[in-house]
Structures are given as C-alpha cells and as structure tokens.
C-alpha cells in the first residue's frame, strides 16, 4: 500500500 489523499490511507 502507499499513502494516498491528505490522510495516509491505502490506495
């Protein structure tokens, strides 16, 4: 997984 969006959420 990688950080997505302004919060670090899984893509």
From Swiss-Prot:
UniProt key word Disulfide bond: yes
Modification type Cysteine amide: residues: 11
Gene Ontology MF terms in the entry: ion channel regulator activity; toxin activity
Tissue expression notes: Expressed by the venom duct.
Residue list for modification 4-hydroxyproline: 10
Main location (coarse class): secreted
GO cellular component terms, A-Z: extracellular region
PTM summary: Contains 2 disulfide bonds.
Keyword terms: Amidation, Disulfide bond, Hydroxylation, Ion channel impairing toxin, Secreted, Toxin
Domain of life: Eukaryota
Disulfide bond positions: none
Compartments, record wording: Secreted
Function: Probable toxin that inhibits ion channels.
Entry note about domains: The cysteine framework is I (CC-C-C). Alpha3/2 pattern.
Protein name: Conotoxin Ama1245
Lineage summary: Eukaryota, Metazoa, Spiralia, Lophotrochozoa, Mollusca
